[in-house]
Amino acid sequence: MNLLVFNLKMLIIEGVIRLMQKYRVVSLFSGAGGMDLGFIQAGFEVVWANDVFSEAVMTYKNNIGNHIVQGDITQIPSNEIPDEIDVVIGGFPCQGFSIANSKRSTEDERNFLYREMLRVIADKKPKFFVAENVKGILSLGGGKVFEMIKEDFRKLGYKVDARILNAAEYGVPQARERVIILGNLFGVDNPYPKKTHYIPSNSPQKLDLFSDESVENLQPAITTEEAIGYLSDVRLSHSPIKVNNKIIYNHIASENVADKFWGRKYEVNQHDICDYLKEWRAKAGWSTKRIDEHFGYKHTAGHWFRKDNNSGSIPKPEDWWELKKILGFDDKYDKEVTTLIEKEIKFEQSLRITNWDRPSDTITATGPEIHVNKKRRLSVRECAILQTFPDEHVFYGSLNRMYTQVGNAVPVRLAKLIAEEIKSSLDINS
């Protein structure tokens, strides 16, 4: 009997210790810490994080902790990253992937960032990993790139699944669709969170009629007005302000929303320009990385050599002339690319006006979301609220850098719901 009591006590003690212990997380491409905050709110401990951009690191340190390391992940060896990790999280950049005869092209140096996440997972062997990415990753190379990505994770021993989650269906006031890849070493079903909200049928982002989830117990999606309407008539301020008995930070916005802008006089096909520049880059023997370094645009110049509709771009006139100097290309597209004229903005077509009575459109790093009744961009704080950052989460850096940090983040609430499901699975299977 005494032995039975002793064993029972030991089981209870082990259970209490397990409850007190926090699962350990390593975060890659952490940015301002949206996904990290969600995991922390769910009871995890983020023991190490990394980002290359100084402003994002400053925001992270001042709000979450000093465990973030600023630097290029390719230059950080695995032995400098903590061991005994339960979960690795991050949104690896998807630029740099291409398909040639069903094999990866090594021409573009940006795909190394994907390999770095794979490296950390291979070396640390976390029980779970979470990778977030844009929907466009599914169609790269006709879908072959994404299948290769999943297969790489499977080769490490993980059961891998991927789903498109719309944040608005999880209590985020924003119709943000992202691919969430989950992997686990237990071989169990990956634990995606259940929907908590539904998007009414009068919204462009309709309820999925083929979903097996009933809407009876779901709440209506949170509208933009419900989330940020109380700030509509609050004057922009660089200083903290008190609104509804709480302190609001970063209620600052770009007011450079003019009726006219300088745009290209002639239509230019971005795909043709991309092929043209890649041909001359090859002739000149310049890598994308070398061009990045020449311009000082870390991970920016590469946009000129991509056809992705979401991330490919045509150089500005001043950049075009500089490219011409270093690559030595002919005059074929000079006129089309560099001739600018003043154009009128058609707000309903050229800028996204915030719709008040439904979840916001996707908050992005660069695309301006224009306030429904103010001639300005949504403020940094309004965007942060739509990303479900806490009111006390303060962003640092220039105005554009703050917008970038908010737009690149994973919504905190969505991350928390994902983390809670992973925690439950860890509790059962560890």
Give the ranges of each region predicted by the language model.
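Short alpha-helical segments and helix-capping/turn motifs at coil-helix boundaries
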Residues: I73, I164-A168, K346-E348
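Short, solvent-exposed loop/turn segments at secondary-structure junctions
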Residues: P93-Q95, K135-G136, Y170, F186-V188, ...
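Conserved Class I SAM-dependent methyltransferase catalytic core
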Residues: F112-N184
